[in-house]
């Protein structure tokens, strides 16, 4: 990890009282935060709300945004239907690697576990956090009649300390897996978004800017 990102990570750990000394886990929380905070009000969620838990397979963070609110339970899905009579949904999936290179096997694994997630089958070997998120997603699709403008959108963020170069092999892996996800007929759109080291630094700094008046 370069010295600039190291400094940002140290500040994040201090500011959010991250209570693990494991730098890999710290970076997972950091990646989850910068992705979600740049798409959703950072003051309206806690780091634990978007973590898939310790040693969850293949996916480090998931944010389920329903009607512009972060949803953290099945009951909140039901409440959103009750009070809004609609479901506008966006799934944000996050996987982070502290390494300085984008690896095809890791990206493939991220997609594989994302596809497994959307089989909607909780498993006792998964973390409680991941099982809870699977149940939330299942509740969303059970109530598909409330989709208002479109089916849910899926965005997959892969965060790494390397440099993104549009590598042909990686691009092939990504494109093939996107097609497989699209063929599930669950999503309005599927998008893969790489965060390389420069993007990580830029997006972290954006989280520190004052919120502009709307």
PLM segments and residue spans:
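N-terminal extension/subdomain marker
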Residues: 1-214
């Amino acid at each position: 990890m370069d010295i600039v990102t190291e400094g940002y990570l140290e500040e994040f750990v201090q500011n959010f009282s991250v209570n693990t000394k494991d730098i890999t886990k710290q970076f997972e929380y950091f990646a989850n935060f910068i992705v979600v905070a740049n798409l959703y009000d950072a003051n309206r969620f806690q780091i634990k709300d978007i973590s898939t838990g310790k040693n969850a397979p293949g996916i480090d963070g998931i944010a389920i945004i329903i009607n512009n609110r972060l949803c953290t339970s099945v009951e909140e899905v039901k409440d959103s239907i009750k009070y809004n009579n609609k479901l506008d949904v966006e799934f944000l999936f996050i996987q982070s690697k502290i390494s300085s290179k984008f690896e095809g096997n890791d990206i493939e694994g991220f997609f594989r576990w994302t596809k497994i997630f959307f089989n909607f089958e909780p498993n006792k070997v998964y973390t409680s956090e991941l099982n809870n998120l699977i149940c939330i997603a299942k509740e969303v699709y059970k109530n598909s009649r409330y989709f208002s403008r479109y089916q849910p959108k899926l965005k997959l963020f892969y965060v790494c300390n390397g440099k993104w170069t549009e590598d042909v092999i990686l691009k092939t892996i990504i494109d093939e897996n996107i097609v497989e996800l699209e063929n599930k007929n669950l999503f309005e759109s599927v998008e893969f978004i790489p965060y390389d080291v420069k993007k990580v630094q830029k997006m972290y700094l954006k989280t520190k800017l004052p919120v502009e008046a709307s």
